[in-house]
């Protein structure tokens, strides 16, 4: 997985904060 996120991806993650934290844990 590419750790770098596009602007659109960042916006989507900011909307679903709980999901974003889970995704970031998976990326680590």
Swiss-Prot record:
Transmembrane segments: none annotated. InterPro entries: 14-3-3_dom_sf (IPR036815). Belongs to the 14-3-3 family. This is 14-3-3-like protein 4. It comes from Pseudotsuga menziesii.
């Amino acid at each position: 997985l590419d750790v770098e996120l596009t602007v659109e991806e960042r916006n989507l993650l900011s909307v679903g904060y709980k999901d974003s934290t889970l995704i970031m844990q998976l990326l680590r």
